Amino acid sequence: MHEDSTYKKSIYIPSLKGKSKTLLSILVGTLMYQSAIADTQHQEENLPMLHMDTITVYANKQPPINVGDDLKTAKTISDNLIDSDKDLVRYNPDISVADAGRYGSNGYAIRGVDGNRVALNLDGVSLPDKQVSEIFSAYGYMFEGRFSPDVELLSEVEFEVGADSFNSGSGAMGGSVSFKTKDPEDLIRPDRQLGGYIKTGYSNSNEEFSNAFGLAGKNDKVEAIINYVHREGHETKNHRMLDFDKNKLDPAYDFINDPDYKYPSTGYRSNTAAILPDPLSYTTEATLAKLYLHLNEENRLGFHATKQKTDRVSNNFTRKTFASRIGKDTAELESYGISHRYLPITSEFIDEVNTTLTQQKITGVANTETYSQVWGSDSYRVDGVKHRPQEDKTIQLSIEATSLPLETEKLGSHTLSVNTKYAKTDHRLTLEETYIPSSGNPSSWYDFIGPSVKQDIFNVAIQDKINLTEKLDTTIGLRYDNYNYKPYMDEINKKAIEKASKYYPVRIDYENGEFDHNKKMDNIGGMFSINYKLSPYLQTQYQLSTGFMAPATSQMYSAFEMMGNSLTPNVHLKPEKSLNHELSLSGQFEDLSFTATGFYTKYSDFISLLNSQEEQQRCYEDYSTGQPVCSPLSINILSAQNIGDAETYGLRLGGVWDVGQLADTEGEIQVFANLNYAKDKTDKGTNLLATQPLNATLGLGYESPKKDWQLSANLRYLGRKHAEDAKVATLESNGYNMPYENVIAPYKHIDKSKSAYVYDVYGSKKLGSNLKLSAGVFNLFDAKYVPWDNLRSLAELNVNSMVDDQGVGIERFTAPGRNYKVGLTYEF
């Protein structure tokens, strides 16, 4: 459901009897009883106009087919104290976010899939795929996060639940997330020409301080906006809520003997797993600027620029190597572009044409410094650096055109739209190693993991919205995508491969032209929906939609061999595909609205790493004779293959009830509830761990008659994952030198999955006409639980997934305990 302003104002007030109350809890509760500070009559008249303008934006949206679809606006982000991608989906039981440790998040999980199988785009330009193979994830040296724009710069975030490649292209297997940056109109009230804000905030779950400002202006000829945000924070705390300690970023810090790293009741310690999150400190700066020039009544020329950079420093205590490890990582976005909007005044056919040219560069740098103890001293020195920058460049031209409604005698009214894009991308990954001896000069070299890859991407989509009768309407869409992969060896690639032995299998592949193979692939997909009004209040809807995911460049071209494991390229991969069915019943009454949706999604041609044992010749050079010495070896061959099918199905219920008249109050009171139930299975007998267990949200909200204060609270039910829904395949051997076999069994930590009830209370109060205080207490009753997304991440090899054989490390993955946020905003 696209959430409107009433949907956000949700409150559930639990009993506080017998519970300790923090100062902030009292502050938030007090907001409900404070009287409004008087404004002038003119200012009071302006506020409802601004509120109604926001509602109008929602009303212009097409009715959502699936109740799981969700729209977050800048107002929602501000009112709900949203600071991160996890906050965006806090109350959406369909969608979740998985951590990527020191690298941020792994993107969103929707309909049982996550990572690259959920498409992300910023202002219509795709954000790059994660390019890390499972074989390298265990070491933690590769940048594994997916880029996420800072929420402070966003006007809207739209979540589409279910296959959505018609709108979002590659990756929208389970759904998509579209980020739209702010425009001047987001900061300017309807009756003014200048607007802006200054904002400061604090969150104690990660000790983040944030400061932001925005300024926008407009007249008949020009519109402009500039928006800036700065954040400083630390690792997200677990249930213990221990404060950040900067000393823990010292590579010499003694975690083993720190009393915080043992259980108070048992005194148990572990040197293979921590019970607190790894220490981390980060700084984010982001800036948005836009300028629009109205050339005449029909034409507008625009310029836009976005820049964002996050620097992180972390001490990776939970590692798989002996040496102390400090991560110094960077995620950076640079985006620039020009746009043109054409709104013809006299045309009887064209409604609007938008053309945009954008250049986007996203860089993810994983820098890992390893340290060793100085002999006879307590100090540590840097003995090595692993430098892993990934760079993704995109230049994209997009054209969108929409027609006015075209009336026909027998086939109803048709509204046509065409959307076409052409993009050129360039992906580069560098592996640089530096060894720093205690004396002498450092030495550096490059390792080869695969070529750089350019892509030419073209797509065109055509849609027809048909209003057949007053009761029946339908939408039909068809889309074509074409991908052309072009691998190439840059100078660093050549240096890396040419330093290897001439008998190194990957070098032999290079010399035989294995990395010169271009690859073309295409996909045809679409969508179909039909809506029928059963009565003035009830409507039934059916939607069919398709999704696909073009293989990541790393899946097609990565190559590496080490310790009997050989990762081989595969240019014969096909796109993954999905087919989604949804059937909904929705009702819209005077004070009540609801939607019930049943869904079924079929996934095919899943790409996974396939293991196989082969006996192959391996050679090395006898330096005394210069001749090769060869012998047969058992090699574990790893290659990405289209080997999997899966399906997910379930039910989503949601509704909003306006009880203001029933309660006989002058303000607005709404009750809302959402529930999501989903199951899945694969053709291998395993499960899609990204499928969420039973989740539900119940809320009750109040907003004062003058719109000058509101109080909200939610109760979230987070269900446990059952063993029969969490089966995984693991490689096991019956003994030394025995072959490994796939064994399917419940995930080994499934017993740690427990259900939980989590209460949140938050609100805001206008302190005059321009100043607003916002505050919230989250996990009010200090529930201790491990979110399913945290627990399932342990099923994947990762530097941050260290849990010892007694399960002690699970403690580290608990959600934050009782925590609070507070913010102060001055708007003008």
Predicted regions and their residues:
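Transmembrane beta-barrel wall of Gram-negative outer-membrane proteins
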Residues: N204-D311, E332-Y336, K410, L468, ...
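Face-selective signature of the C-terminal outer-membrane beta-barrel domain
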Residues: H294-Q308, A331-Y504, M527, N531-K533, ...
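C-terminal beta-signal and adjacent terminal beta-strands/loops
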Residues: F548, F599-D605, L609-N611, Y717-S733, ...
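A beta-strand signature from Gram-negative outer-membrane beta-barrel systems
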Residues: R146-Y197, E827
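N-terminal periplasmic "start-of-domain" segments of outer-membrane beta-barrel proteins
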Residues: M52-D83, G107, I135-Y139
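Short acidic/polar hinge/loop motifs at secondary-structure boundaries
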Residues: L127-V161, A289
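Gram-negative outer-membrane beta-barrel transporters
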Residues: N467-T474, N482-Y483, F599-Y603, S612-E614, ...
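Outer-membrane beta-barrel signature, preferentially recognizing the C-terminal barrel domain
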Residues: K320, I326-T346, I449-I457, N512-G525, ...
